[in-house]
Structure formats: C-alpha cells, structure tokens
Amino acid sequence: FNLVGALTVFSSEYRSRHDAKYIPSAWDNRFVANISGTYDFSRGWSVGAKLSAIGGTPYTPYDVDKSSLVEAWNASGRPYYDYSKYNTGRLDAFAQLDVRVDKVFYFRKCMLGIYVDLQNVTFSKLRQPDVLMSTGVIENPSAPPSEQRYKMKYIRQASGTLVPTLGVTVEF
C-alpha cells in the first residue's frame, strides 16, 4: 500500500503601476492539492485512486450595460468586459476523483498488463464564467438607435464527464 499527497498554497498577484493595488493574476487559484494511493492485491491485481483539487480561477465580469447596447453588440458581435473590475470574479473550486484497476500477467520473457482507468468518477463539473449573449430581441425599439438595447441572457458553461480508458502494457 502506498499513499502520497501534496498541497501547494500560493497567491499570484501583480500591480499595473507601482502605486496601484494588487490584482489577482489569471492563474491565482490559491491552492492545488493531490492525494494518490495504490493497493496491490494478490494474483497481480492492483487498485489506485487519485483525488485532485484546485481553487477557483479569477475572471473579469462583463460590462452588461455596454454589451446590451445594440450599436455596441452589432459592432463586435460579443460582450464587452468590465475592465474596472478586472479579475474580481472568482469561480468555484474544482475536485475530481480518478480510479484505476490493473491486472498483470507474468510470462517467462515478458510481462503483460491490462488496465481500466476512470477519470472523474464523481462527474464533477469544471465551471467557466457564464457567457453573456444577445437574444436578438430589442427591448426598447422605439428609443433612438444609440439607446436601443438587446435583451441579454447568460449561457452557463460547465464541463465534466467520466473519461474511461482501457490500456495494455507490455514489457520485455
């Protein structure tokens, strides 16, 4: 049986000018943690697992007011960031559990190993900032063109699925 763990705690910030306040950098997750272990059974079987966790990433929120203006949206086709709030948002932390089962066969001049590896068995979802989108519907069509606004909506972004892998190893 073996068990290994690592924890890294950090802060990554910078200033745009020497007299400015510190701002979190894009990779300021605050922590990264990993714990992994394996257990060897008889007859060439082994089971391993790894738990990984990482703190939330900072992000810059959108300028919803500017983005909803019809003229602004039509000029860029995408939302505008609110750079006065640069990296003030922070996503949730993320963790996932991976599990692997191995079976080894020994022959006179070689070893054959087969394994099943399941990544993210907990189906954890890695969040990204929600995307601000125009619905294409103008909420105030009778307003002057410079004041017309699109109705906006957020699209949630999250990914996370079980990733199975079957493998074969051969050693001579």
Predicted regions and their residues:
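Active-site/pore-lining binding-face segments in mid-to-C-terminal subdomains
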Residues: N87, L97-V99
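Extracellular loop and loop/strand-boundary signature of outer-membrane beta-barrel proteins
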Residues: S16-P24, S84-T88, K151-I155
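Gram-negative outer-membrane beta-barrel transporters
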Residues: F1-P61
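C-terminal beta-signal and adjacent terminal beta-strands/loops
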Residues: A53-S76, D92-Q96, K103-F172
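Flexible, solvent-exposed coil segments and beta strand-coil junctions
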Residues: F10-H18, A75-Y83, S142-R149
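Residues embedded in well-ordered secondary-structure elements
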Residues: A26, T38, T88-R90, F105, ...
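Compositionally biased, intrinsically disordered low-complexity regions enriched
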Residues: R78-S84, G89, S134
